[in-house]
């Protein structure tokens, strides 16, 4: 009679799972389930120019005399799932002379308002709310048109001392206002 060595035991153990896998398992009871899910559209807030893009440069003009501000306006299109959204400036608007950074425009003012409506002043750290018109039907995004207006007075000094190319960066945040359920 042969004795089983540890090697033979290992070989015998290798065949045990094969025997266990060959067993038939019978399932009884409920074998199907119905799963339902609700998919919600993500909250959309898209701000563009009229052509679906964005502005690369807005050129300010001084239409009055030397003591009048330089101004520019831009038309914005706001598409939103929610009717209400809020806007704030990320940083104060600073318009500097590219050759002489010490020369800056004074009292910059940034406003936004419904097209043809009252303009609201935008500022850093303060959210200002706006509302798009009602959508034409339920489940459709609202679309509103707004006028962005920027104005600032030229730097102190005469025309000869302040002449030059000026630039600045306008950084704003648009956020949807979410209602609690």
Residue ranges and their predicted role:
Residues 90-149:
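Surface-exposed, polar helix/loop patches in the mature regions of secreted/periplasmic/lumenal proteins
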Residues 4, 15, 131-134, 174:
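Selective for proline/serine-rich intrinsically disordered segments
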Residues 1-3, 22-29, 122, 126:
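A detector of low-complexity, intrinsically disordered, Ser/Thr/Gly/Pro/Ala-rich segments
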Residues 2-10:
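Bacterial N-terminal signal peptides that target proteins for export
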Residues 13-22:
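Hydrophobic h-region of N-terminal signal peptides that target proteins for export
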Residues 22-104, 142-181:
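N-terminal small/polar-rich segments of proteins
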Residues 18, 43, 134-137, 177:
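Generic low-complexity segments that are intrinsically disordered, proline-rich and/or Lys/Arg-biased
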């Amino acid at each position: 009679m042969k004795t089983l060595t540890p090697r033979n035991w290992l070989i015998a153990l290798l065949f045990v799972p094969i025997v266990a896998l060959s067993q038939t398992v019978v399932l009884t009871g409920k074998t199907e389930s119905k799963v339902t899910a609700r998919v919600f559209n993500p909250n959309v807030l898209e701000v563009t120019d009229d052509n679906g893009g964005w502005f690369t440069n807005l050129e300010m003009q001084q239409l009055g005399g030397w003591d009048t501000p330089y101004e520019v306006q831009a038309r914005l299109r706001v598409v939103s799932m929610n009717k209400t959204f809020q806007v704030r400036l990320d940083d104060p608007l600073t318009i500097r002379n590219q050759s002489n950074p010490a020369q800056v425009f004074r009292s910059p003012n940034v406003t936004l308002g419904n097209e043809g409506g009252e303009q609201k002043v935008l500022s850093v750290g303060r959210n200002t709310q706006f509302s798009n018109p009602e959508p034409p039907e339920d489940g459709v995004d609202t679309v509103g048109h707004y006028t962005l207006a920027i104005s600032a007075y030229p730097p102190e000094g005469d025309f000869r001392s302040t002449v030059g190319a000026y630039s600045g960066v306008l950084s704003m945040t648009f956020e949807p206002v979410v209602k609690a359920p």
